[in-house]
Amino acid sequence: MESTKGSEWRRWELHIHTPDTQKNDNFTGSSSEEKWEKYYQDISTYIGSGDDPLKAVAVIAITDYLSIDNYKKVIADNKLPTSVKLVLPNVEMRIQPIANDSPINIHFVFNPDIISSIESRFFLKINFRYNSTTFSASHSELIRLGNTIDSSLEGLA
């Protein structure tokens, strides 16, 4: 493989939240569907065809707190501009202690090839305690935590 082009720089946006994000969903729209359509339209308008090097984005990481559900939705919807060559899942977490009155955020960007095992290899391994009960960060355990905190939530998830 011989190339005379040299290095090629590409823009990556590794912290992109979506509608229905777990925290601070500030997207506008009268319904979830409307928020998502506007989201995809805004990205397409900004990136365009990918020809403008100042706007072209080759890689996007879909970010959410303790979840990859919206990443899966973006992949299933397949509505990003074709100039976006790779979409990565990015799990965001806040840890203690806070720094300068602000929480410390940690981002875990995963290879899309391991999506099917993130629940068992990542979320199930994150453990914490609430009222002397241990929970993991898996989807089912977070529901159990919610029901423990407020039993009126039972059966809503």
Where in the sequence are the language-model features?
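Extended substrate/RNA-proximal surfaces in nucleic-acid metabolism proteins
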Residues: 2, 72-157
